[in-house]
């Protein structure tokens, strides 16, 4: 099989089979899988994503579209730098070596990529454009620097976005993340929050789960901002944001973030307060915040209720209020908020009912809307009426106003690492922040770098770091932070339209290809990459780089490939090939020591539950691997790797060769009886497989093609064979299978005597008239209960159906010689005889 696969890969390369023009008269179709990080090797878990995209690309080509199906490399990132530290070599060397190896692997799988458009994000010819784009954002005040409390990963020595903190730990290193103040660069994605939110409803071809995740991440809240005066210091106020200002008469405390500015100004830092602040600083993300037990510590401050000066509320530092949401302060209404209720019970604060409820709010918070009670001038109003009324009062008193808040925060793009795109900024003591002039771009990374594992090597590289200011020529220093790697992947899809464009994009090419018709990748990118790419596209539109404002028309999120995990007696992870099964137990191949089989999980390097691609290719071939990862489960669902599954796919491919040989040896028999059922199945299969592929039901399409192959095999084994239909059916089968298993089908297609390659042939057409059945089966009921079935010819009349079904023995038994009261017909489905 490997010889056949290599033969066709060579032919495709020589014929430039998958290189496409930007000036075709055909309708365009742009299919794209999320570009990979060049980690070194592709395992079979990655193959599924690329196989899905390849089926769609090949199918749409056969449908007559000009298909763009490119590939490139998201090549900056921490693993390369970590490898550089480990091996004392430049990350560039490690990265380019990995790219070479992975490109070879992708080609060996027969994927139909247009390699002439390949991009590499660590190539200065690529990132010089994003450096210029950043400067354009800076000129528009969409990029800025500020001191910010950041998530600091002490192992990777870098800043992490909130999305990159999972359960308080760094998403790559697993280290406990701490809070630290650093000067950081930000992009004003919040300026686009409303459009990003509103446009979600137009993304009709995106999974509902992803749309919902983006809506929640943007997190629009409508409410009010208003001020509480501090008791005994009424010149000073605390501003709060609330989505339920109407519950103001149920307030029992003010909750503030651990880093609220009022703490520095007015709070005496007792050991208890200092310890609590330190504890809060380790809470890094909203997911961890939601899981944490609600706690607080009293500051010693009180505020005065805005509508009743006799009511004072304690100011409490809490672990569930964040400085970067709203104002960093809330008023707590325990009767109507679960978090406030939990804290009130713990700290023995008052719980006052302000919305009518058929429950005891002393025990549980009532979180629904309703009629206001115990609320002075708001009594008797609905929640919405009361909200409008109380905001009006805030505005009259000059202490507050209606406001909108977003959970979405500006995107922190600074990373304190070497292997990333340098931020093109120079810091001058005289001139301040100075953009690198366009003519001096790209700012490239130095080659002579010392990797000792401590911080950012750019900070310790004097000849790179120290430069003259472009404005005043005085000594200055370069910005040593590099871009978050999501910067590169937020615009790469535009570069594929013409990867040799002199500017960031070729506008004409982008107008032809964009938006991407189908984008394929993991759901884990729903609130980072996909949101950032949408944001970049909107800004690129305003900068006249593209005409679209949304990058991806359709999105498909594939399931993961899973495999069992294994550990030895020392709790070390083992590769599957190191384990052998004896009976119902597992043992180490070499030591013969007992091995524990763990959970079936996503394939990952860390847990070693990977299946090596090259080993599988040598054993089964690329086509068998492609077929297996698509056939055993719907593409959007997870797939468990199984040896029996891949073996079954290999047998099916071998069967195709046997079928070809058998059919090739058949002699035409003009007297053979036509197999109408087989002919009908051929046309039905063409129709249904096309529909399945369009709906990404690839496993169902494969099942239909297996059914057709079985029917053809059954016909071949008969004494009298309908040779013409068999040959036609087999030709169709080979065409239908081509997007899934391109190597063997091209080989058989050629042997069948076809001159045109399958990769640029048309998808087979079906004859609508052939789909009509000669007969159909009806269920025969008596008084609504099934008593029999009967096969009728399609030409039968209603009267004939009634006569036949009434005379059936199983029906006569219930009629007992009487005439039916009524006969109800559901055409071609049911006849119901009422007795």
Curated annotation (Swiss-Prot):
Motif position, 'HIGH' region: 36-46
Gene3D superfamilies with a match to the protein in the record: 2.20.28.290, 3.10.20.590, HUPs, Isoleucyl-tRNA Synthetase, Domain 1
Positions with a binding annotation for ATP: 605
Chain location of the short sequence motif 'KMSKS' region per the record: 602-606
A Pfam family recorded for this sequence: tRNA-synt_1
Enzyme class per UniProt: ligase
GO terms under cellular component: cytoplasm
Molecular functions (GO terms): aminoacyl-tRNA deacylase activity; ATP binding; leucine-tRNA ligase activity
Keyword Ligase: yes
UniProt record similarity statement: Belongs to the class-I aminoacyl-tRNA synthetase family.
The protein's name in its UniProt record: Leucine--tRNA ligase
Annotated source species: Rickettsia massiliae (strain Mtu5)
């Amino acid at each position: 099989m490997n010889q056949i696969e290599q033969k066709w890969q060579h032919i495709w390369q020589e014929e430039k089979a998958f290189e496409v023009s930007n000036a075709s008269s055909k309708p365009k179709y742009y299919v794209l899988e999320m570009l990979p990080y060049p980690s070194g090797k592709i395992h079979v878990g990655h193959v599924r994503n690329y196989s899905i995209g390849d089926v769609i690309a090949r199918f749409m080509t056969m449908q007559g579209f000009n298909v763009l199906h490119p590939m490139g490399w998201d090549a900056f990132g921490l693993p390369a730098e970590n490898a550089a530290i480990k091996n004392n070599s430049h990350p560039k060397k490690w990265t380019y070596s990995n790219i070479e190896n992975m490109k070879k692997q992708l080609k060996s799988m027969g994927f139909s990529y247009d390699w002439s458009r390949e991009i590499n994000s660590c190539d200065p010819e690529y990132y010089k454009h994003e450096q210029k784009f950043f400067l354009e954002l800076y000129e528009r005040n969409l990029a800025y620097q500020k001191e910010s409390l950041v998530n600091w990963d002490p192992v990777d020595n870098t800043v992490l976005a909130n999305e990159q903190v999972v359960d308080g730990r760094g998403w790559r290193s697993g280290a406990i993340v701490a809070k630290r103040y650093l000067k950081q660069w930000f992009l004003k994605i919040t300026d686009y929050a409303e459009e990003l939110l509103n446009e979600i409803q137009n993304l009709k071809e995106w999974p509902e789960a992803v749309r919902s995740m983006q809506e929640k991440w943007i997190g629009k809240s409508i409410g009010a901002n208003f001020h509480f005066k501090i008791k005994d210091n009424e010149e000073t106020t605390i501003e709060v944001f609330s989505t339920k200002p109407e519950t103001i008469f149920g307030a029992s405390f003010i909750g503030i973030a651990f880093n609220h500015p009022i703490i520095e100004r007015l709070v005496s830092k007792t050991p208890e307060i200092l310890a609590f602040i330190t504890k809060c600083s380790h809470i890094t993300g909203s997911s961890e915040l939601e899981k944490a037990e609600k706690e607080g510590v009293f500051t010693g401050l009180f505020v005065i209720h805005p509508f009743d000066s006799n009511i004072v509320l304690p100011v409490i530092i809490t672990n569930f209020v964040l400085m970067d949401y709203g104002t960093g302060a809330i008023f707590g209404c325990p009767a109507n908020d679960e978090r406030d209720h939990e804290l009130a019970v713990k700290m023995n604060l008052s719980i006052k009912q302000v919305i009518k409820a058929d429950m005891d709010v002393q025990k549980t918070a009532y979180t629904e809307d309703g009629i206001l009670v115990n609320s002075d001038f708001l009594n008797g109003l609905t929640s919405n009426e009361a909200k409008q009324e109380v905001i009006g009062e805030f505005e009259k008193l000059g202490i507050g106003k209606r406001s909108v808040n977003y959970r979405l925060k500006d995107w922190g793009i600074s990373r304190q690492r070497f292997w990333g795109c340098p931020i093109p900024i120079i810091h001058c003591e005289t001139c301040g922040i100075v953009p690198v002039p366009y003519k001096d771009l790209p700012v490239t990374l130095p080659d002579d770098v010392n990797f000792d594992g401590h911080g950012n090597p750019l900070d310790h590289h004097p000849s790179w770091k120290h430069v003259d200011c472009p404005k005043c020529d005085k000594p200055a220093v370069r910005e040593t932070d590099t871009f978050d790697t999501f910067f590169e992947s937020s615009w790469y899809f535009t570069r594929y339209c013409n990867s040799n464009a002199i500017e960031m994009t070729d506008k004409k090419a982008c107008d032809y290809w964009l938006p991407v018709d189908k984008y394929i990748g993991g759901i884990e990118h729903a609130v980072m990459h996909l949101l950032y790419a949408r944001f970049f596209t909107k800004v690129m539109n305003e900068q006249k780089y593209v005409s679209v404002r949304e990058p991806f028309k359709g999105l498909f999120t594939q399931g993961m490939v899973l495999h069992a995990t294994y550990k030895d007696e020392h709790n070390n992870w083992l590769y599957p090939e190191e384990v052998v099964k004896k009976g119902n137990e597992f043992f180490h191949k070499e030591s013969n020591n007992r091995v524990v089989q763990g959970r079936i999980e996503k394939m990952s390097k860390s847990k070693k539950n990977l299946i090596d691609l090259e080993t599988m290719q040598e054993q089964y071939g690329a086509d068998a691997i492609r077929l297996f990862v698509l056939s055993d489960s719907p593409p959007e669902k997870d797939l468990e790797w199984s040896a029996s599954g891949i073996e079954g796919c290999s047998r099916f491919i071998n069967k195709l060769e046997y079928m070809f040989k058998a059919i090739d040896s058949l002699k035409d028999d003009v007297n053979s009886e036509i197999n109408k059922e087989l002919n009908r199945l051929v046309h039905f299969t063409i129709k249904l497989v096309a529909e399945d592929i369009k709906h990404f039901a690839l496993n169902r399409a494969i099942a239909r093609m297996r059914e057709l192959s079985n029917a053809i095999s059954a016909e071949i084994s008969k004494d009298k064979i309908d040779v013409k239909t068999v040959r036609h059916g087999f030709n169709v089968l080979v065409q239908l299978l081509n997007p899934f298993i391109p190597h063997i089908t091209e080989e058989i297609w050629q042997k069948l005597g076809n001159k045109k390659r399958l990769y640029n042939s048309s998808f087979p057409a079906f004859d609508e008239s052939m789909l009509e059945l000669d007969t159909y089966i009806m269920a025969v009921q008596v008084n609504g209960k099934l008593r029999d079935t009967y096969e009728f010819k399609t030409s039968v009349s209603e009267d004939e159906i009634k006569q036949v079904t009434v005379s059936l023995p199983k029906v006569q038994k219930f009629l007992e010689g009487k005439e039916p009261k009524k006969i109800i017909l559901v055409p071609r489905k049911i006849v119901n005889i009422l007795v």
